[in-house]
């Protein structure tokens, strides 16, 4: 059975200040060994306090998710541009007797339209994953044998005892999974469930023993396009490939990458890493190793200037027996797009994944049609929602107007300089060259530089 008694708020001992956390503790007996109880903790400090439990449950999953590690969640809560730190973080802990068997890192947030209606604002509150964006399929943490009952216990608690929300949403969920099924099973007269379309994730299963073997698995047309553009690139000047791994080595290239972002097609769009100072700080902490990911960087230089770069994160250190890599951010110089530096980056990323024995290389979301050419298979997902029938979210979901207007407003704000010209001037080139030189001056471990001769050996095609 599932125990769901009312709760009271108790401060967490030893925690104070702006990151003060609270525990919602159950009153009464927890019941016999077969009963499940759901408790909740609030605040950023709770992520630190319960870090060992969060990470233990993550490793118990079929596929450990670095975006659900305690380090990533804490970094997201403190640095993400989307939310204010210390507001709305809420971690639900599911126990069987005294044993913790499940965890759901979540947050409460108010939609913009909810702020316009005064005392009815609570009807516009959304309860969602703590880190819903810039992640891979966020959800609950539990061992495979516990997933169904943990999901059921969580949904029962949220529907019966967690007050003041209009929509419960889990983004990026595969249909048919335990969490997805539990949300739909909770639908009744008070709540309705729906699947909202979402862009698929794309992922390469790393099954090749070498970069050459992978390259040969691509279509003849794809191989021809990649090799032809690479030869054009190498004919344009002095090309050098950069491979960096580890916090210090990748950090040395971060400012160069941010400058490159301003010379890419992303300049002035919502896709730019520089669209918000908090976003820059968020990724700076990721590459510095502060988010639980092992940072990696792949770069292409032409005549002493970085013209393409890819930031990668892996979970090899946290999960040495079952690890993969995720492409986090990528950019290339738009003025040199005809040389195909972006294509070369993706090829090199697959090669690095093979070298490191990753089980998969994830390209995240968007542009699935293009990523499929690289043997990346789509992972179809939906944003599964449970909507309180008497809520602003329900009205918005039926009408669809408020959300579209708000989304368009956000895009307008983020893309005011969408027409900005990313074509570099002579001064831009000089600045880029200086930043690249500063990165090259890093003399610590973790960096490989391949000149033309080494590239002839490394690449699976003729570059001359």
Predicted feature locations:
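Conserved GNAT acetyl-CoA-binding A-motif
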Residues: 164-172, 353-364
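Hydrophobic, well-ordered secondary-structure elements that form the walls
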Residues: 304, 342, 346-349, 353, ...
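A short, internal acetyl-CoA/4′-phosphopantetheine-binding micro-motif in the GNAT/acyltransferase core
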Residues: 135-147, 330-338
